[in-house]
Curated annotation (Swiss-Prot):
Domain of life of the native organism: Viruses
Chief subcellular location: membrane
Stretches that traverse the bilayer: 11-31
Listed name of the protein: Uncharacterized protein R799
Gene Ontology cellular-component annotations: membrane
Keywords: Membrane, Transmembrane, Transmembrane helix
Subcellular localization: Membrane
Topology in the lipid bilayer: Single-pass membrane protein
Amino acid sequence: MININNNMKTIIILTIMILTIIIFTRTINGLQLEPVKFMNQKSGLIEIASNNLNLQSLTTSVKNGLIAKSVNLNDNFINSVSNEIYLALGVTNTNVQRMTWQVNIASNVGTMDVFYIEATIGEKFVVINFHTIQITQPMPQLYDVVEKCERTGSRRYGIAGPRARECRYHNVPRSLNTDELTLVTKTLESKVQEAIKIMLQ
């Protein structure tokens, strides 16, 4: 009877320790993020002759001009910006300003590419001034504690009875859960205004 009570106490203590480790690990990894970094800053000008431009040729020129500067934007944003520029053609000294960002989260880092475009409509040219910067959020490796038990211990009654269960605990790498993905995304998006200041200074 004494052995059973001791075993129960051991199990209870181990259970409390494991739960504490899991909660502590998830709190540290899920909430305490390193400071973000700003990198890969680029800027440049694209000039497009405005004579006899149609929407399709304008869109193609904007896309190709950005690609030539090693700036890759999604087609929806390029189409939207090009449409606004096209509607402003003929109204000289008009500015079209647009901004967007794209978030990408991998296992060890989250990134957000911020893009700012200002197009000035002139008499003969459309001048596009673009700025881009990448915000990175380093992340620690995340783990789950997994229990593996086998009946490899000594028998309860010497040579008879079932063997005692022996358990080991392993740290198994895991990916971000939904709450952690949301946290990283919000952390990156909270830096948009700071990114704009850096790009335009």
